[in-house]
Amino acid sequence: MKRMRSSLAAAWWLAIGLPAAAEEGVRINPTDPQPTCIMCPGTYIPAAELERYTQKAIAEKLIDQQVRDIDIGRARIGIGMVHRGRLERPAPDSVAEHDQISEVYHVISGAATLVLGPDIVNRQRRPSTMRTVVEFNGPGNNGSDVRGGIAYEIKAGDVVVIPAGTGHWFTKIEDHIDYLMVRIDPDKVTPLKGEAQSLDYLSKPAARGE
């Protein structure tokens, strides 16, 4: 009887100890590389919401709109939707450059000529109060040309990577171009924006200057 009690006690302690041991087994070894975003949730953005941004841009004559701005630990990721209409020749001083934020374009529809290069002619500081500077892509400059720039004919399905400090300049748009933009913000210079803020923005006309 005494032996049976001992066996039962051992089994009980083994049973309650196993979950703890299993938990220890899945814990990250503190000497291993650690996640740079601790217990961070993923983010999903449905295509229907992105399409609402494009329709809003067309209806309200907007160009660049921020859909999300997400903290991923050591950086933030912005998701933007951009709609540009027909452009026969570039506007004056329309070269853009961002000091701290890199951008990735995924072209959804349309086609355009995009010039890229770091040597910007007649560099002019963007006002720090501009909405795009404050909320979208941080401080940067405009310019009148890109010295030695390379012109790319971009179309639906193409991807463009624009490092911080690289000038980018639309010189011709056949009819329109729509693209999704990923903004990489390692210095966290732009404010966060979640789903609730996005849906609220979409529910009413954009304020003047947006």
What spans do the regions from the language model cover?
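N-terminal secretory signal peptides that target proteins for export/translocation
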Residues: 1-4
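Short alpha-helix capping/helix-loop boundary micro-motifs
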Residues: 144-149
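Conserved metal-binding segment of the jelly-roll/cupin
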Residues: 153-174
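Bacterial N-terminal signal peptides
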Residues: 7-20
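A short, N-terminal "cap"/entry segment at the start of jelly-roll beta-barrel domains
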Residues: 22-98, 192-200, 204-210
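His/acidic/aromatic-lined binding-pocket segments of jelly-roll/cupin-type domains
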Residues: 96, 102-106, 151-152, 159-160
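Short, conserved beta-strand element in jelly-roll/cupin
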Residues: 99-118, 128-142
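A short hydrophobic beta-strand segment most commonly corresponding to one strand
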Residues: 175-191
